[in-house]
């Protein structure tokens, strides 16, 4: 029977046994270990050299002691080094075992902590949703209507509580006029010059998909239905989903900044405020919600309509919202108070509105209807000043160019029409493939490019109105498209639950 050292796993030359652990060791190894640690290496109990019990076994004849210059001396030195390595290896094995036990314990603790955090997060989210639904910043709403103003409703409709409408006061009208004057002056100064930083058409034509994100909205209720970019920082992306949520996403860090919950139905329109950390959303639940991004909370609920809200646009002042609805009305609301200032319908039409968009100057705006009409309205007078017929299906999207005199419109007739607001006529029609659906139209900030999203994404250069770019990456219908600053990138969303970016 051979004895094996518990430290080196080799047959010992001078075996001994520890009465503390009953293990066999090579005497020279265990003496070195005791000199360093004073314990038994197996159970860490106190152990001294005197306690070691030698085991009598037959030994081979030992060679004479080696001299310092002989090969046996070298072998002896190697033996000592090997002994040290064995001791170190044994210590490392013990430490590894201890570390494994500690890691296992830490993983169990981490798993338990994650479960607690998830439960608490769910409870906090539910509490916030309840608060946003039951008490949407009641303290911010002005308790009394403006005494000097009268409610302003044009056309026939269901009777309304007069206390809900404040009216277009002279101060508001003057504010709108002053802003329009400033914007018109700035546009004239710019003239027809194109910013030097704007991406050239030959560069834009080389754009390819560079990123795709599918984790913004729920996978169980797929579909991103609305898209907007922050005008002051186009790296901040706003989306609205079929999962009833509004999401703020940072393109540069690829992180979700906020997930805003409160709508009871899908979110179909979203708008970013250009200078405040506010975002706006509209839904078929007949509400418009104003959200604080830093607080991830709803600060105001605007109840301007009796039916689904179909369009949303922010006035250039940043203080007022335009909305359209299936209830055949458009409404003009104050974002600070959440009050509806005026609510108007065209009694001659009697048709639901499908979209709404402010002109860049803010004194006129356009609405689309279910019966193929595009209507231009004077905001100050609340009157319909022009109609653009020509489409043969419900209007799906309208977009004003920053140059101030182009209007692009799309409908369920697989075409995009371009209108000259100065001459009030259609000067160009982009006839698309049969059954091509258009859900989103937008000009870039310079008015140089027009993007449309629907069956796929197409980019046109204005004036020539020729297609320079075509993307088919979405596996579902494209619902939103937008340009980055100076068209440095293009963003799109679709029913495939993805947010995609295109650039060089």
Swiss-Prot record:
Residues with PTM N-acetylserine: 2
An annotated GO BP: protein polyubiquitination
Broadest EC class assigned to this enzyme: transferase
Start-end of each WD repeat: 219-259, 262-301, 304-345, 348-387, 390-429, 433-472, 473-503
Pathway annotation: Protein modification; protein ubiquitination
GO CC terms of this entry: cytoplasm; DNA replication factor A complex; lipid droplet; nuclear speck; nucleus; Prp19 complex; site of double-strand break; spindle
Keyword DNA repair tagged: yes
Residue segments, region May mediate interaction with PSMC5: 68-223
One Gene Ontology molecular-function label: identical protein binding
Residue intervals of the U-box domain: 2-73
Domain of life from the UniProt record: Eukaryota
EC number: 2.3.2.27
Reactions listed under catalytic activity: S-ubiquitinyl-[E2 ubiquitin-conjugating enzyme]-L-cysteine + [acceptor protein]-L-lysine = [E2 ubiquitin-conjugating enzyme]-L-cysteine + N(6)-ubiquitinyl-[acceptor protein]-L-lysine
Tissues in which the protein is found: Expressed in white and brown adipose tissues, brain and to a lower extent in liver, kidney, muscle, lung and spleen (at protein level).
Keyword Hydrolase: no
SMART domains recorded: Ubox (SM00504), WD40 (SM00320)
Residue positions, PTM N6-acetyllysine: 122, 179, 244, 261
One Pfam match: U-box
Record keywords, A-Z: Acetylation, Cytoplasm, Cytoskeleton, DNA damage, DNA repair, Lipid droplet, mRNA processing, mRNA splicing, Nucleus, Repeat, Spliceosome, Transferase, Ubl conjugation pathway, WD repeat
Induction of synthesis: Up-regulated in differentiating adipocytes. Isoform 2 maximal expression level during the neural differentiation of P19 cells treated with retinoic acid (RA) is estimated to be 2.5-fold of the expression level of the untreated cells and it is detected 1-2 days after RA treatment and it decreases steeply thereafter to the basal level. Isoform 2 expression level increases steeply after 1 day of RA treatment and is estimated to be 4.2-fold of the original level at 0 hours.
Coiled-coil ranges (or none): none
PANTHER family according to UniProt: PRE-MRNA-PROCESSING FACTOR 19
Similarity field: Belongs to the WD repeat PRP19 family.
Subunit structure: Homotetramer. Component of activated, catalytic and post-catalytic spliceosomes. Component of the Prp19 complex/PRP19C/Nineteen complex/NTC and related complexes described as PRP19-CDC5L splicing complex and PSO4 complex. A homotetramer of PRPF19, CDC5L, PLRG1 and BCAS2 constitute the core of those complexes. The interaction with CDC5L, PLRG1 and BCAS2 is direct within this core complex. At least three less stably associated proteins CTNNBL1, CWC15 and HSPA8 are found in the Prp19 complex.
Record note on domains: The 7 WD repeats are necessary and sufficient to support interaction with the RPA complex.
Protein name: Pre-mRNA-processing factor 19
Organism: Mus musculus (Mouse)
Lineage: Eukaryota, Metazoa, Chordata, Craniata, Vertebrata
């Amino acid at each position: 029977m051979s004895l094996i050292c518990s430290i080196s796993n080799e047959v010992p030359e001078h075996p001994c046994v520890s009465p503390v652990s009953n293990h066999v060791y090579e005497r020279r190894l265990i003496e070195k270990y005791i000199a360093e640690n004073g314990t038994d290496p197996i159970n860490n109990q106190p152990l001294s050299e005197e306690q070691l019990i030698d085991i009598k076994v037959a030994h081979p004849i030992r060679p004479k002691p080696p001299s310092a210059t002989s090969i046996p001396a070298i072998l002896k030195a190697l033996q000592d080094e090997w002994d040290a390595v064995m001791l170190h290896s044994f210590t490392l094995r013990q430490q590894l075992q201890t570390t494994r036990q500690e890691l296992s314990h830490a993983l169990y603790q981490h798993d338990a902590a994650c479960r607690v955090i998830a439960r608490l997060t769910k409870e906090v989210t539910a509490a916030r949703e309840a608060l946003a639904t039951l008490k949407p910043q009641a303290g911010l709403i002005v308790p009394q209507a403006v005494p000097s103003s009268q409610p302003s409703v044009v056309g026939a409709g269901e009777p309304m509580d007069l206390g809900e409408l404040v009216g277009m006061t002279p101060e508001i009208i003057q504010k709108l006029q002053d802003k329009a004057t400033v914007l018109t002056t700035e546009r004239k100064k710019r003239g027809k010059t194109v910013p030097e930083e704007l991406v050239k058409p030959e560069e834009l034509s080389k754009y390819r998909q560079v990123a795709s994100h599918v984790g913004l909205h729920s996978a169980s209720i797929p579909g991103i239905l609305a898209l907007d970019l922050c005008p002051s920082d186009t790296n901040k992306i706003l989306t609205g989903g079929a999962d009833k949520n509004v999401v703020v996403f940072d393109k540069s860090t690829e992180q979700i900044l906020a997930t805003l919950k409160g709508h009871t139905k899908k979110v179909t329109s979203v708008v970013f405020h250009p200078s405040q950390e506010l975002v706006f959303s509209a839904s078929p639940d007949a509400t418009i919600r104003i959200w604080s991004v830093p607080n991830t909370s709803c600060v105001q609920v605007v109840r301007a309509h009796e039916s689904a809200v179909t369009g949303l646009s922010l006035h250039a002042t940043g203080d007022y919202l335009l909305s359209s609805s299936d209830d055949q009305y458009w409404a003009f609301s104050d974002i600070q108070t959440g009050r509806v200032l005026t609510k108007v319908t065209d009694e001659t039409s009697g048709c639901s509105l499908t979209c709404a968009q402010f002109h860049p100057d803010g004194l006129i705006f356009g609405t689309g209807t279910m019966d193929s009409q595009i209507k231009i309205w004077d905001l100050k007078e609340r009157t319909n000043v022009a109609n653009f017929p020509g489409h043969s299906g419900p209007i799906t999207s309208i977009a004003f160019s920053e140059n101030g005199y182009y209007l692009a419109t799309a409908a369920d007739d697989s075409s995009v029409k371009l209108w000259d607001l100065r001459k009030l006529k259609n000067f160009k029609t982009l006839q698309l493939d049969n059954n091509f659906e258009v859900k989103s139209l937008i000009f870039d900030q310079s008015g140089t490019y027009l993007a449309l999203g629907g069956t796929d994404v197409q980019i046109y250069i204005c004036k020539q109105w020729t297609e320079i770019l075509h993307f088919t990456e979405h596996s579902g219908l494209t619902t939103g498209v937008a340009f980055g600053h100076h068209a440095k990138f293009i963003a799109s969303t679709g029913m495939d639950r993805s947010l995609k970016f295109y650039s060089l």
